[in-house]
């Protein structure tokens, strides 16, 4: 994991002109990969409401594998912008999750797969990573809690898989869209009663949504049409791990 922390440190300091780029020149000149293939696959096999046609996806498995190989050959460098890096890792996580499901399909839940988030299955450069490492050691450390609404764990209670690839130039609007959509989805969060019932994502990753000056309620109120009281007491809904597959 040493290279992950080195890369993140370089990324966080890349805006400082006084910092020297210590990456090898060949890596520093590497351009970000295109996400066009992934975008086309998503538009073809994911419905607007997030249902995934895994049977159809499997017909294009080779295209998905090729896309992941391209990402693996284009590991991020300190010269990439923050939005470029975020889009890269979100797309990588989601594409790798779809491939993981295809490799074990048919199944009823991602949790039917041994160590779905713990096994190192993802090649980036000369190292292998697990889905858990991509999420916890890279994406979460980049400090944007909205990634929790962008990465998809192939389950009904997860944020839906967006039917388009994330891209540097549209990332901000995409993250705002998925955050607002997830928070206001009554199947994932229930604000109908006196006591809000939230997705367990807000329980598991509560510290990602809070700062010294802002609470979880403050974060939620950014996206709710009717703000919650500052001292609202919340509870959490059960998490449905059933596969987010399209019903044929």
Question: What is the predicted function of each stretch?
Answer:
Residues 2-15:
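Sec-dependent N-terminal signal peptides of Gram-negative exported proteins
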Residues 16-248:
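Interaction/scaffold regions that mediate signaling and macromolecular assembly across diverse proteins
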């Amino acid at each position: 994991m040493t290279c992950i922390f080195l890369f993140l440190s370089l990324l966080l300091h890349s805006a400082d002109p006084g910092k020297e780029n210590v990456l090898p020149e060949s890596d520093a000149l590497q351009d970000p990969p295109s996400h066009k293939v992934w975008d086309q696959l998503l538009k073809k096999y994911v419905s607007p409401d997030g249902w995934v046609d895994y049977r159809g996806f499997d017909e294009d498995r080779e295209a998905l594998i090729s896309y992941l190989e391209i990402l693996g050959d284009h590991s991020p460098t300190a010269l990439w912008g923050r939005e470029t890096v975020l889009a890269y890792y979100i797309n990588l996580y989601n594409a790798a999750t779809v491939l993981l499901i295809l490799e074990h399909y048919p199944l009823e839940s991602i949790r039917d797969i041994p160590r779905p988030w713990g096994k190192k299955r993802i090649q980036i450069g000369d190292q292998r990573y697990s889905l858990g490492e991509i999420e916890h050691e890279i994406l979460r450390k980049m400090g944007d809690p909205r990634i929790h609404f962008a990465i998809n764990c192939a389950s009904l209670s997860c944020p839906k898989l967006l039917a388009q690839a994330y891209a540097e130039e549209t990332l901000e609007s995409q993250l705002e869209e998925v955050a607002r959509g997830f928070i206001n989805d009554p199947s994932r969060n229930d604000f109908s009663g006196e006591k809000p019932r939230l997705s367990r994502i807000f329980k598991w990753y509560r510290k990602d949504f809070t700062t010294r000056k802002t609470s979880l309620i403050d974060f939620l109120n950014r996206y709710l049409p009717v703000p919650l009281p500052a001292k609202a007491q919340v509870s959490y809904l059960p998490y449905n791990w059933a596969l987010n597959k399209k019903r044929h």
